[in-house]
Amino acid sequence: MKKLLFPLLLAAAMLPAQAADYFLPDIECDGSANVRAAPDTHSKILTELDYRSTQHKILGGQGKWLRIQLNGSRTGYVHQSQGYIVQNYIVASPDGSANVRHERVDVGQPITGQSEILTTLPNGTRAQIIPKSNRGDWLYYTNQGAYTEKDEYGNNEHIEGYIHKSQLRRAD
C-alpha cells in the first residue's frame, strides 16, 4: 500500500496548480455587494463591498452563492448577481507592453488591433480579466479595485477595455 501511495502523491504534486478565480462587485448593479454569514438573504451581513474593494478569492460555491475569502481567516457568502468572477493575468508581451483597446465597439463588430488604445500596460503588470465579457481572442480587462492607472491629477482612473490574449499569461 505504501509503495502505491508514494507514486500517486508524487504525481499529484507534479500537476500544475489551478489558478484561482476571484470576486469583484458590480459597480453598476447598485454600487455595492453584501457579504453574508450564510448563503441566503436573511443571514447576517458581515461587510459590504463597493467599487473601491479589491478582489476576493472564491473558495467555493453553493447554488448561486459564492463563498469568498475576507481578511484573515474570515469567509462569507455573496450572491453571484452582485458582481463578476475575475481571473488574474500578467502582461507578458514580446513587445514589452500590452495595449488596452476601447471597450465600446459597435454590436457585431470585431475588436481589432486598430481599435482605439485607452492605455498601455508594461510587462509585469497584473491584469484583472472578466471571462464572461471576453470576445474571442480579446480578453476583457478592468482595473476596478486595483486602480493601476492614474489620471493627470494623480487620482485613480477606472479603465475597462480589451487586451489580446497573446499579450497575457494566467497568474495565481
Please place each PLM-identified region on the residue numbering.
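Beta-loop motif signature
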Residues: E28-K64, S93-R135
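Boundary regions of SH3-family modules and the immediately adjacent low-complexity/disordered segments
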Residues: A20-D21, Q69-D95, T142-D172
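Generic "edge-of-domain/loop-turn" microfeature
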Residues: F6, D40-H42, G63, S73-T75, ...
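Sec-dependent N-terminal signal peptides
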Residues: L4-A13
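Peptidyl-prolyl cis-trans isomerase
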Residues: L139
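Sec/Tat signal peptide C-region and signal peptidase I cleavage site
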Residues: L15-A19
